[in-house]
């Protein structure tokens, strides 16, 4: 999977992906109060399509991804926009969790790539502060699209 996303890094910011990231960012802004006080984890944040707009409003954002090329693109954009409150980590949190908890964890179009939903759920809970929030944005299963989830799969987790 890492190789696939390294290969896609320079072309990942397509109009479709930018549009989807903007929708998620709007949902975060509507559902989360006082972003300026929040420490956010963008799990699998890739090229920073969510990280950068959130960092402009949040106390800090940690972008974690397994693809060094995706992170390279995110760093370049952060430098161009002079955004300094982002920590970039190339790391698989399932293998090496962080020793930090967050107010908000954002997981956008990543969960369907993870082979073990229970391990992912445990990982997110491990990294959330007691009153923290988890925002998941992923695909739903349809007859045409088998990637993603049916809502009951996630609701009781």
Where are the regions a protein language model picked out?
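Conserved class I S-adenosyl-L-methionine
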Residues: 1-35, 73, 143
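C-terminal alpha-helical "lid/dimerization" subdomain adjacent to the S-adenosyl-L-methionine
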Residues: 13-19, 133-157
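A conserved beta-strand element that flanks and buttresses the S-adenosyl-L-methionine
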Residues: 106
